[in-house]
Curated annotation (Swiss-Prot):
It comes from Listeria monocytogenes serotype 4b (strain CLIP80459). CDD domains: YitT_C_like_1. This is UPF0316 protein Lm4b_01790. Belongs to the UPF0316 family. It is found in: Cell membrane.
Length: 174
């Protein structure tokens, strides 16, 4: 294999690894996983120094710089895909039902979710408001269940910053 192609491929692959670890580490930091984030930063910096030195030692070839830049972009996508699969943390799902249905919260509770519900008033009449806390990895499954039960439901999710008490108090890891 030609040495130039080998260097370009190495720069590309090493930078994908670096940025993937960087992206996952950043997300771990934001989720509060301090020690895991710190450990991953050690590997991140080792890979970064290797990738950067390869580029700086071979600046005479524009393909090396392009491989570095493209590897950076691909690494962000790969890192985000990995984080989506890991799905760390919890989400709060707010549901506004199409119609007032007293049985809906119990149907969702029967699926293993903690649900708080109350009467809400919408433009077209009474609705039921539900608040559900679940692990992010269960988000799509929860959406599917809600839509099966109430296809016209309005669903919004957000990521809680802190959790204290309630249904999840014994299960939530700090």
């Amino acid at each position: 294999m030609d040495n130039g192609i080998f260097i370009v491929a190495t720069i590309f692959i090493v930078n994908i690894l670096y940025v993937t670890i960087y992206t996952v580490r950043l997300l771990l930091t934001m989720k509060g996983y301090r020690y895991l984030a710190a450990l991953s930063s050690v590997f991140e910096m080792i890979i970064y120094v290797v990738a950067l030195s390869l580029v700086l030692d071979n600046l005479n070839n524009i393909a090396n710089v392009l491989a570095y830049a493209i590897g950076f972009g691909v690494g962000i996508i790969v890192g985000m895909k990995i984080e989506e699969r890991i799905a760390l943390g919890y989400i709060t799902v707010n549901v506004i039902t199409k119609e007032y249905n007293l049985d809906l919260p119990n149907q969702i509770r029967d699926l293993g979710y903690g649900v708080t519900s109350w009467l809400a008033s919408g433009r077209d009449g009474e609705r039921m408001m539900l608040e559900i806390l679940t692990q992010r990895k269960n988000e799509r499954k929860l959406y599917k269940h809600i839509i099966e039960i109430d296809n016209g439901a309005f669903i919004v999710s957000s990521e809680p910053k802190q959790i204290h008490g309630g249904f999840w108090v014994k299960q939530v890891r700090k």
